[in-house]
Structures are given as structure tokens and as C-alpha cells.
């Protein structure tokens, strides 16, 4: 029995990146032997064990053979005779098929992963890559993380991904798996690379048709020098990741904010009146299909509906600002206003030439919200108030607080 460190921990160490969890592969053992050493079995589909002291995952070396459609149809062989090289061959990309012998720090790299790391190439290991459609989304997710380091996908890997899409392999993916890859990509520094990669291999229209529909829809060049709405969406996603690193909730809201532009009648192009209202239905549809968590869905709908109001905040009456806060449920969920402000700033800055622009509307919205939030029912003279009168008096007090919080000379945001 011998164990090797494999996968992401080895890859990230070679890239000089912070390593995540350590995963190990065990050669020459069977489940009974692992249990006798105190390892706890946790794998459902194949033999995986937790180390009795460290809690790290140790998986028996295995091979996988396709015997059905989709990503679930595999026969797993975890016999003790399976070699390390055979186990590494079943993995997706060469950079993930590097093992380290911790006893002497020797790298085992049978498929050229070290060279691909040096060349900044994401390359599949074997034709078996095409047997698992989830790997198309994994490739896109890896690009969201690795593109800032200069990585690109090998041409032959892109060709295989396109063929997988053309063969209908991605139609078997369940919504939960799509959401898992999408949400993880939103936690990385360049989520636009996820969208760009999927679109390059014609997969975006299969798994995220609402987003794919944005590409080719023009915006007014005076306000959007990038013109294409899909490109604007990519820019917004990357700015959101910069403003709120690792925040998938904000990332998803930013992703959905302009979905309504895909539904604008062509006769009104490149203008998009009412796109915030039109975007509510596709945002709801996308969220429900992918079974997105409720808090993600709610913030996405808020961002879709309210982003133009935040852009033109200086033009809104005090009572209109209060109504905006109420629609956001901002007095019970105060965190939503700061989140909305970040999404709106990402939208404003997600345009060619505006990436570093100042966005005072966001700070001002938070300031108005804080002023209104500081007023509560206990502050009222309730001696002569009854029933709904209390709520009405509280609303008026909060509107006065908003009025007293000051104004600023902001933009109108009308043409966003």
C-alpha cells in the first residue's frame, strides 16, 4: 500500500497558488485494509475514506469505463492492482493528473501536466474526456480561475468540447450540476472566462440560454462603447468579482441584471426601454430551472428591477427612495442595499473606458438607507397612534430621515 498527493493541491503548489484541500490516492489497498487502519468510508459511488486524524480524503486508485449516456454511466474498478498511472489517466486535464510522492517529493507526471502548467495550457488527457459532459463546464470553470494566469485551452480540447456539445451530451446534465459549476466560477477572479469558454464551444445556448441570448444585441455606443450586450455582461461579471471577491451571491445578481435586454423589440435597438421589467421573467426562469438558492434568486430579481433606479438616484424623490428600500425589504434585510450598490457599480463600470470610474450613487444609496434604518417605531410619539397609523408614521419619519441625509450631484443612468 502506498499513497500519493494528487490533483489540485499538487497543481496549485506548482503554480505558486494557495492550495485547497489535500486529496490522496491509495495504490495497492482494498476497503477492508483501509478500515483496519482506522479510515472512515464516505464514498457512495467509489471507495473514498477519511484519514482518522487529519480528515483528509484518501481514494483507492481506480479506473472508470463508460457504459451509458451522460456523466453517471460509468463502471468503476478499484481493484488493488490498479496502478497510479491508470488512476491519473481517468482524470480530466493533464494539469490535474500530477501526483507527488510525499516520502521523497518526487513528481509522477505521466501525461505532461508539468509542461502544460509551464506553457499555461489546459489540455485533456485522453479521448475518455468526451465520456463525461460535465467536463465541458469544468473546463469553463477552470478558465474562470486560470485565465488571469495566462492559461488558454488547447485547440484539440476545444474541438472535442465542441463535438460533445454537437452530439447532445450536455443535454443530460441535471440543473444542480450546472448551478454548481456556474456558482463556483462566480467565486473566481474572471467569471467572464466561464461564459466566454462556453460560448466558444456552443455550450452557453444549451446550459444558459438566457445569457446566450444577450450576445449580438446592440446597445447605444454613446453609453456602451462595447456595444454588444453579451460583452457588457462579461465586463460586469469581472468587475463584480473585483469589487466583491469570492461573493457568489453578488456575482449571480450581476449576471442577471440585464437579461431583459435580450427581449427588447428589435425596432427599438439600440435603446432598451423597460428592460429592467422585461428581465424579471428570464431571471425567475433561470433561477427556478437551475434550482438556485432563494437568497440568490431574490437579490438577482432586486438587481434586475432596481439597477436603473440606483443609477439615477439623485433624480428620485425622497418617498421614491423609501419605496425602493421597501421593495428591497431593506429594513428586515439591511445587507441587501450594500449588495445592490455593488451590483450597480459593477454595471456602471462594466463598459469600455469606464472600468475605473467613480460611482457615488452606491455610497449615497447606503447613506440614505442607513439614515432611514436608524429610525424605528420606538422613536415615535405613539400616544395618539393606533393600528396602521403607526406604520404610516414610521414611513413618514423614515422619509424625513432620507430627506435630511443630503443630496449629491449624480448621474441619471437613463440610458443603461
Swiss-Prot record:
Magnesium is required for nucleotidyltransferase activity. It comes from the Bacteria. Mg(2+) binds at residues 21, 23. One of its GO terms (biological process) is tRNA 3'-terminal CCA addition. It holds the Pfam family PolyA_pol_RNAbd. One of its GO terms (molecular function) is cyclic-nucleotide phosphodiesterase activity. Monomer. Can also form homodimers and oligomers. Belongs to the tRNA nucleotidyltransferase/poly(A) polymerase family. Bacterial CCA-adding enzyme type 1 subfamily. This is Multifunctional CCA protein. It comes from Xylella fastidiosa (strain M12). The gene is cca.
Amino acid at each position: 500500500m502506498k499513497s500519493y498527493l494528487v490533483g489540485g493541491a499538487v497543481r496549485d503548489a506548482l503554480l505558486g497558488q494557495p492550495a485547497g484541500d489535500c486529496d490522496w490516492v491509495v495504490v495497492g489497498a482494498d476497503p477492508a485494509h483501509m478500515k483496519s487502519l482506522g479510515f472512515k468510508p464516505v464514498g457512495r459511488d467509489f471507495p473514498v475514506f477519511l484519514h482518522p486524524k487529519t480528515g483528509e480524503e484518501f481514494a483507492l486508485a481506480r479506473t472508470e469505463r463508460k457504459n451509458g449516456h451522460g456523466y453517471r454511466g460509468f463502471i468503476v474498478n478499484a481493484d488493488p492492482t490498479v496502478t497510479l498511472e491508470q488512476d491519473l489517466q481517468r482524470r480530466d486535464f493533464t494539469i490535474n493528473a500530477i501526483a507527488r510522492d510525499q516520502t521523497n517529493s518526487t513528481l509522477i507526471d505521466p501525461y505532461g501536466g508539468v509542461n502544460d502548467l509551464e506553457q499555461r495550457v489546459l489540455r485533456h488527457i485522453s479521448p475518455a474526456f468526451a465520456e463525461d459532459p460535465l467536463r465541458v463546464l469544468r473546463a469553463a470553470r477552470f478558465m474562470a480561475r486560470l485565465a488571469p494566469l495566462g492559461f488558454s485551452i488547447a485547440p484539440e480540447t476545444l474541438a472535442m468540447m465542441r463535438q460533445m456539445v454537437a452530439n447532445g451530451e450536455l443535454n443530460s446534465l441535471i440543473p444542480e450540476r450546472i448551478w454548481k459549476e456556474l456558482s463556483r466560477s462566480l467565486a473566481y477572479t474572471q467569471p467572464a472566462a466561464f461564459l466566454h469558454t462556453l460560448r466558444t464551444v456552443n455550450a452557453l445556448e444549451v446550459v444558459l440560454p438566457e445569457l446566450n441570448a444577450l450576445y449580438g444585441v446592440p446597445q447605444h455606443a454613446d453609453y456602451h462603447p462595447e456595444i454588444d450586450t453579451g460583452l457588457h455582461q462579461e465586463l460586469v461579471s469581472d468587475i463584480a468579482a473585483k469589487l466583491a471577491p469570492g461573493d457568489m451571491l453578488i456575482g449571480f445578481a450581476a449576471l442577471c441584471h440585464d437579461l431583459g435586454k435580450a427581449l427588447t423589440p428589435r425596432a427599438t435597438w439600440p435603446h432598451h426601454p423597460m428592460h429592467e421589467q422585461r428581465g424579471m421573467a428570464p431571471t425567475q426562469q433561470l433561477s427556478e430551472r437551475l434550482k438556485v438558492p432563494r437568497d440568490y434568486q431574490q437579490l438577482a430579481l432586486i438587481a434586475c428591477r432596481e439597477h436603473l433606479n440606483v443609477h439615477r438616484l439623485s433624480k428620485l424623490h425622497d418617498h421614491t427612495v423609501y419605496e425602493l428600500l421597501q421593495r428591497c425589504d431593506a429594513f428586515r434585510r439591511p445587507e441587501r442595499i450594500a449588495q445592490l450598490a455593488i451590483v450597480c457599480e459593477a454595471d456602471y463600470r462594466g463598459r469600455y473606458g469606464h472600468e475605473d470610474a467613480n460611482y457615488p450613487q452606491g455610497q449615497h444609496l447606503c447613506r440614505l438607507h442607513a439614515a432611514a434604518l436608524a429610525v424605528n417605531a420606538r422613536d415615535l410619539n405613539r400616544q395618539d397612534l393606533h393600528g396602521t397609523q403607526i406604520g404610516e408614521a414610521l414611513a413618514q419619519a423614515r422619509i424625513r430621515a432620507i430627506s435630511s441625509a443630503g443630496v449629491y450631484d449624480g448621474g441619471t443612468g437613463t440610458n443603461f
